[in-house]
């Protein structure tokens, strides 16, 4: 996600006898960790401590299915700020559901982005076509990381980070540009 947002999640169900009630306010912001980071900053007992693990579990389960194309969410920090409970109707399940509702509402507003895999491309080509190769890498949304002479005789090296989706058919394209003299390797970054 790219923005910091606060979201409310309220799970309330009454069906004769005991109902279900869980209510949370959670702040979502970009995190620095690959996994979701969970904190609680609840004051005054508005959400009892024994429900904190249920809120965290609800968020962790929800993170497995992102709001964009259903992919898992990474680099997320979630902070439980506030909420409310009912002495009879509140349960761990109700707070787990409330957290999942807050997650769905909050992430929609938090400017989510879909990440794509990036790879490390090394291209060995004759010096005479270095400009063409660099132009082609730029056209493929690549970031040139370095260039210069290589250990392979008569060939220069261009190193770049390139989105994986842009490297399909690269072998054919490189062969055409270099008249069969270019070599490349592609590894995940």
Predicted regions: what they are:
Residues 1-189:
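Accessory interaction regions appended to the cores of large information-processing enzymes
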């Amino acid at each position: 996600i790219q923005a910091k947002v606060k979201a409310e999640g309220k799970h309330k169900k009454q069906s004769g006898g005991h109902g279900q009630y869980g209510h949370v306010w959670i702040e979502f912001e970009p995190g620095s960790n690959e996994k979701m980071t969970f904190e609680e900053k609840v004051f005054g007992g508005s959400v009892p401590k024994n429900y904190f693990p249920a809120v965290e579990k609800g968020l962790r389960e929800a993170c497995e299915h992102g709001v964009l194309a259903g992919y898992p969410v990474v680099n997320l920090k979630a902070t439980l700020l506030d909420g409310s409970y009912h002495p009879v109707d509140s349960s761990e399940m109700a707070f787990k559901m409330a957290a999942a509702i807050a997650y769905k509402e909050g992430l929609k507003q938090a400017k989510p982005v879909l990440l794509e895999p990036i790879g490390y491309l090394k291209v060995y080509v004759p010096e005479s076509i270095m400009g063409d190769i660099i132009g082609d890498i730029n056209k493929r949304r690549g970031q040139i990381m370095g260039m210069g002479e290589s250990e392979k005789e008569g060939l220069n090296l261009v190193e770049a980070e390139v989105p994986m989706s842009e490297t399909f058919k690269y072998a054919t394209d490189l062969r055409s540009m270099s008249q069969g003299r270019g070599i490349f390797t592609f590894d995940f970054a």
